[in-house]
Amino acid sequence: MPTKVVKHFLNQGLLRTKIDEWLAQNFYEAGYSRVKVVQTSLGTNITIWAERPALIIGRRGATIRRLQEVFQTVFGLPNPRIRVEQPENPMLDARVQAFRIARSIERGIHFRRVAFAAINRIMSNGALGVEITISGKLTSERARFEKFKAGKVYKSGHKVDELVDRASAYARLPKGVIGVDVIIVKPGKPGDHVRIKSEEEVKDVVDAIRSEIESLGLQEETASTLREHMEAARPGEEHEEDREES
C-alpha cells in the first residue's frame, strides 16, 4: 500500500496534469506551452508559458483575475499568483508548433503546405531535426496519415530525454478530427555527432603537424651537434690537466 508521502506526490502530479490539460484546452489560441506550479507557505506561484501571453493576461488583466478564481475554486490552490511568459524560442517548442499547425488546418490551409512551412520554420531556427505526423480524414473519407521529416530525429536512447521535445494537438473540422504530432530535436551535440573537416581545415592541421615535426628535428639536430662539440672538447681538457700535473 502506498504511504502518505507517496500519495501526496501522486496527488500533486495528478493536479498538475489536470491544470495543464485545462490550460491547453482553454488557451489553445494563445499557443499554450506548459505550466509550472510551486506551492509555498505564502501561497501558490504559477508560471504559464505561451506563444501569445497577451491573450492569457487579457485586457487590463481581466483574464488573469478569472484564472485566479478558477485556480482557487476548481483546483483548490490557495492564494494563486500567476505570471505569464513567452517561451525562450517558440519555434523550437513542440507544443506551440503543434497548436499552430492545428489552427492553420482549422482555417482551411492544406495540411501539406502547413507541414512544409512548419518544417522550414523550425529548421531555420537551429533544430537538428523535426518530424510532423498528420493523421485523420485528410483527402477522403478513409482515415490515413502522412509523415514529414527533416534532419535527424531520435526515437530512443538517452538523447530523447536531453534533446527531443514532443507534443500533440487536434484540429477539429466538420469532417472529423485531424491529429497533429510534432517531434523536434533541439540544438545540441549528440553523442554520435561526427564533423568532417573541410579541405582548408585539413591543410591547416597538416601544416601545423609538419612545422612541429620540423621543429623537433631541428632540436634533435642541435642537440646532437652540441654532443659532438662536447665530446671533441674532452680530450683537450684532459691533456691540459695532465700538463698541469707534470
UniProtKB/Swiss-Prot annotation:
Q: Which residues form the KH type-2 domain?
A: 19-98
**Family matches, as InterPro entries:** KH_dom (IPR004087), KH_dom-like_a/b (IPR015946), KH_dom_type_2 (IPR004044), KH_sf_prok-type (IPR009019), Ribosomal_S3_C_sf (IPR036419), Ribosomal_uS3_arc (IPR027488), Ribosomal_uS3_C (IPR001351), Ribosomal_uS3_CS (IPR018280)
Which stretches of sequence are listed as region Disordered? Answer: 218-246
Q: Report biased composition (Basic and acidic residues) as residue ranges.
A: 226-237
Its GO CC terms are: cytosolic small ribosomal subunit
Q: Name one GO molecular function term.
A: structural constituent of ribosome
Q: Which GO terms describe its biological process?
A: translation
Keywords, A to Z, come to:
Ribonucleoprotein, Ribosomal protein, RNA-binding, rRNA-binding
> Can you state the subunit structure given in the record?
Part of the 30S ribosomal subunit.
**Which protein family is named in the record?**
Belongs to the universal ribosomal protein uS3 family.
The record describes the protein's role as: Binds the lower part of the 30S subunit head.
Protein name (record): Small ribosomal subunit protein uS3
Gene responsible for this protein? rps3
